[in-house]
Structure formats: structure tokens, C-alpha cells
């Protein structure tokens, strides 16, 4: 049993054996950047969360016994889908795509169990909500009112923060790096690089700046966190204390690409001009 952030309990089952034997469902998940760009920059939004969403999908009768697990009192199996199963995410996404067919892209963006609604007016948002509720009712999908937010100007979606100014990095991800001490092992460097990579859209010249840290991961190399690595680490912390706000790309605006090329890395900054000012859209390296 694992404690949830709200204090409730979540039961987890070790399905590593059945997952390793189960063929992978190759149903494609949406591109996160496209979903984020499609959802931001709307006047009114709602964020929806299904009530134990995975458990609202029934298991196929012949597969129920495959989910069996033992307790001190008896053996049990799942009547509904467990989130621990290998193809649970793909199955959930397939269902969402069917439920919201015709709404995705126009009024809704969905990534597995993350759902955001977007509208350009309050009246339109009411109409969109009506369509979404009818679609959910049609398959008897229930929402969790405690985790839903309606009629707001911004919020968090897929680890990004939507505001009237544009797209912000998740403060929790930034704070996780700010709270880190200087790495003392290869594992801690890997953890730092993983967290920086998760924020790569907001960080210019990431590959070039992290190269001294990446070199510490080479096999056979003696670990030595030197002054150069420490200085880079401090600069990342200074930057992430107040990260840049980026905007969604606008198809009717010219995209400018600025390249930074060195012997060690190639980086690019995508910008567009808005109201006479160049605004960052994306950093790639």
C-alpha cells in the first residue's frame, strides 16, 4: 500500500512477471509538446480528472485471472483494469480518443488521464462542457470533483503551467533542482541531468552547458565533481530560480531560428515576433 498525496491509500501489485510476458500495445500516445501548444493561450479553461480512471475500465473476462494476487487471507483478481499493468496507459488513451472524437483539438486535449478543456469565450466553454459531459455520460465515465477545476484562465497540464503570459516550467520541477546538493556520485549526476532534461524546452544550450557533467558518466572515468561542474550547477540554479516564460508557436507568424554551434554541441532557439518583441518558443539542443 502506498500513501497518496491526499492521504488516501493506493494498492499496488507487483506485475513484473506478467508485464514481461505481455505483448506491448503499440497504440500511439499523443506528442506532449503538441498537446501543450494546442491547449495554451485560450481565455477560459477547465481541468478534468476521472475518478480512479483506470479502475473504470473493465477487464476482459479471459484476462481477469491473470491479474490474480495473494494476500494473507485469500487470493483475488481484478474485475477492472489496474494501473500497474503494462498496457494500461495505451488502453486508457485509446478509450479517451474514442470518447472525445470530434472534440480533441477543437475543445479538448487529452494525454491518458490528463484532460484539459479550452475555449475562447465563456459561452463557448459552457457549450463545450455540455458536449464533454454528454460524451462522458455516454460511457458512464465518472469525474472526481475534488480534482477538477472549472472556468479558470490557467493551470497545470502535463507538468507545464499555463498563464496569460504563456507557458511556464513547473515550479515543482525547478524547485527539485534548487533543493539538490552538489552531486557526489554518478547516480546523483544522472538524477540531475534527468531533471534538467525534463525542463529542456525552457533551457537554452542545455547540451553544451551540461557536457562537463555528461563526461562524468563515461565508463572507467574516475568521478570528480570539479569547480567547473560546480559553477555550471550554480548557474542552472540561478536560471531556474526565475525561468523564462515561452509562448506557443503561431502558424501565421514567421519563426526565427538562432543557432549556437560549437565543436561539442549544436543548439537552437526558436523565436517569434509578437507586438514588436521577439519571444522564445522553444529551445533545442
Task: Please describe what each predicted stretch is.
Residues 1-285:
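Retroelement reverse transcriptase polymerase core
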Amino acid at each position: 500500500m502506498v500513501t497518496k498525496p491526499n492521504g488516501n491509500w493506493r494498492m499496488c501489485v507487483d506485475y513484473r512477471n506478467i508485464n514481461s510476458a505481455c505483448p506491448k500495445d503499440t497504440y500511439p500516445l499523443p506528442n506532449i509538446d503538441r498537446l501543450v501548444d494546442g491547449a495554451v493561450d485560450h481565455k477560459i479553461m477547465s481541468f478534468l480528472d476521472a475518478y480512479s480512471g483506470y479502475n473504470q475500465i473493465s477487464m476482459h473476462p479471459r484476462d481477469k485471472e491473470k491479474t490474480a494476487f495473494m494476500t494473507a487471507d485469500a487470493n483475488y483478481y481484478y474485475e477492472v483494469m489496474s494501473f500497474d499493468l503494462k498496457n494500461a496507459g495505451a488502453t486508457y488513451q485509446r478509450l479517451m480518443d474514442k470518447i472525445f472524437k470530434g472534440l480533441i483539438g477543437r475543445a479538448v486535449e487529452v494525454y491518458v488521464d490528463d484532460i484539459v478543456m479550452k475555449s475562447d469565450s465563456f459561452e463557448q466553454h459552457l457549450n463545450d462542457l455540455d458536449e464533454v459531459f454528454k460524451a462522458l455520460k455516454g460511457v458512464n465515465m465518472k469525474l472526481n470533483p475534488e480534482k477538477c477545476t472549472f472556468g479558470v484562465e490557467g493551470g497545470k497540464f502535463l507538468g507545464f503551467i499555463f498563464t496569460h503570459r504563456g507557458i511556464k516550467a513547473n515550479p515543482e520541477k525547478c524547485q527539485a533542482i534548487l533543493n539538490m546538493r552538489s552531486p557526489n556520485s554518478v547516480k546523483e549526476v544522472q538524477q540531475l541531468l534527468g531533471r534538467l532534461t525534463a525542463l529542456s524546452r525552457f533551457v537554452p544550450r542545455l547540451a553544451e552547458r551540461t557536457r562537463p557533467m555528461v563526461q562524468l558518466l563515461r565508463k572507467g572515468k574516475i568521478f570528480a565533481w570539479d569547480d567547473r561542474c560546480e559553477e555550471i550547477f550554480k548557474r542552472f540554479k540561478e536560471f531556474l530560480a526565475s525561468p523564462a516564460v515561452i509562448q506557443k508557436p503561431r502558424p501565421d507568424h514567421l519563426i526565427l531560428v538562432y543557432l549556437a554551434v560549437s565543436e561539442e554541441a549544436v543548439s537552437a532557439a526558436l523565436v517569434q515576433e509578437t507586438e514588436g518583441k521577439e519571444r522564445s518558443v522553444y529551445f533545442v539542443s
